[in-house]
Structure formats: C-alpha cells, structure tokens
Amino acid sequence: MADLAQLEEQIVGLSLLDAAELVKKLESRLGVSAAAAAPVMVAGGGGAAAAAPVEEKTEFTVVLTAAGANKINVIKAVREVTSLGLKEAKDLVDGAPKTVKEGVSKDEAATIQKKFQEAGATVEVK
C-alpha cells in the first residue's frame, strides 16, 4: 500500500510533458489507447449536458422595466398583483425598473406580464 502512495506522489509530481511521455509508454507497453476512451467520456458528458437544459425553471421573477405612457393603469395593475397601497404602488412604478413579484410560477408570471402589458407597461420575466 505504501508503494502505491509513493507511486501516486511521483505521478502527481510529473510535469505535463513527462506525464504525456508516460502515457505514450504505457499505451505501447499495455497495448491500449487513451484516445479511444476519450470519445466515450465526451459522448457521456454530452448526454448529461443535453439533459440539463430540459429542466424547466419553476420560479420566476417579474420585473417592471418601464411604466409607459399610462401610469395610472400600471399603478392599478401593481395594486392588483401585489396588494400594495396606492403610495407604495406609485413609488414602485416611478422607480422602474423594479421587481414586482418574486418566486411565482410560470403561469402566474405570464398572467402578471399580460396584465401589465395591457396596462401599457414593459415587463420582463426572469
């Protein structure tokens, strides 16, 4: 066991050029090719990478980016969505870009976005 630990330390201490030379010597002596194993790993990694984008985001943030020309309707929409008071809703609209709601479902985010767009505001769902 001590021999393996010592061998490991020696291999880890090799420079890249020495490690590449060691690989070539081991390939010829053992009759294997390290290059043949690499595509298998890449193909497996590619499958895992392709599976990751399939996961859908479950929580969204709705951000009011611009109030538009009809601020009154936008303030009303903010009050409906957030149940804020009149002053707080006005401050939110005047301070755009501001987060209107966080951690909402995809359907709720789409509903909120539609409501704000109908009121004349520009909204971004993140």
Swiss-Prot record:
Q: Which family does it belong to?
A: Belongs to the bacterial ribosomal protein bL12 family.
Which gene specifies this protein's sequence?
rplL
Q: Which InterPro entries match?
A: Ribosomal_bL12 (IPR000206), Ribosomal_bL12_C (IPR013823), Ribosomal_bL12_C/ClpS-like (IPR014719), Ribosomal_bL12_oligo (IPR008932), Ribosomal_bL12_oligo_N_sf (IPR036235)
The UniProt keywords, alphabetically, are: Ribonucleoprotein, Ribosomal protein
Annotated function: Forms part of the ribosomal stalk which helps the ribosome interact with GTP-bound translation factors. Is thus essential for accurate translation.
Q: Which CDD domains match?
A: Ribosomal_L7_L12
The protein's superkingdom reads Bacteria
Instruction: Tell me how this protein assembles.
Output: Homodimer. Part of the ribosomal stalk of the 50S ribosomal subunit. Forms a multimeric L10(L12)X complex, where L10 forms an elongated spine to which 2 to 4 L12 dimers bind in a sequential fashion. Binds GTP-bound translation factors.
Molecular function via GO: mRNA binding; structural constituent of ribosome
GO CC term (a single one):
ribonucleoprotein complex
Q: Which species?
A: Koribacter versatilis (strain Ellin345)
Q: Name one GO biological process term.
A: translation
| Name of the protein this chain belongs to | Large ribosomal subunit protein bL12
